[in-house]
From Swiss-Prot:
PANTHER family: UPF0250 PROTEIN YBED. InterPro entries: UPF0250_YbeD-like, YbeD-like_sf. GO terms for cellular component: cytosol. It holds the Pfam family DUF493. This is UPF0250 protein Psyr_4360. Belongs to the UPF0250 family.
C-alpha cells in the first residue's frame, strides 16, 4: 500500500455513519454501559444497534453507528468505554 492509498482511506469528519463495535464480557450491565457512554459522547443511530453473544456465551458484541465529529471524540469514546470495566476491545 502506498502513501497515497493510505491517505485516501483517511476518515473525513464529520462522519454521519461511523461504525462502532464493542466487545466485552457478557453481563447484565454491558449493553447499558456501552450505550450510556456512546450517548454521552455522540449522536447514536439506534436503528443500527445489534447485539450478539459468542457461541459459548462468554462475550457480547454491541455494534451500531454514530455521528463521529473528530479523532478526539473517538479517543474519548474509547477511553470511556474501557473505563467501564466491561470492555475488552473497541473497533
Amino acid at each position: 500500500m502506498t502513501d497515497t492509498d493510505i491517505k485516501s482511506h483517511k476518515i473525513e469528519f464529520p462522519c454521519n455513519d461511523y461504525p462502532i463495535k464493542v466487545i466485552g464480557d457478557t453481563s447484565v450491565g454491558f449493553t447499558a454501559a456501552v450505550m450510556e457512554v456512546l450517548e454521552k459522547h455522540a449522536t447514536v443511530d439506534l436503528k443500527t444497534l445489534a447485539e450478539r453473544q459468542s457461541s459459548n456465551g462468554k462475550y457480547t458484541t454491541v455494534q451500531l453507528h454514530i455521528v463521529a465529529t473528530g479523532e478526539d471524540q473517538l479517543r474519548d469514546i474509547n477511553s470511556a468505554l474501557r473505563a467501564t470495566g466491561f470492555v475488552h476491545m473497541v473497533l
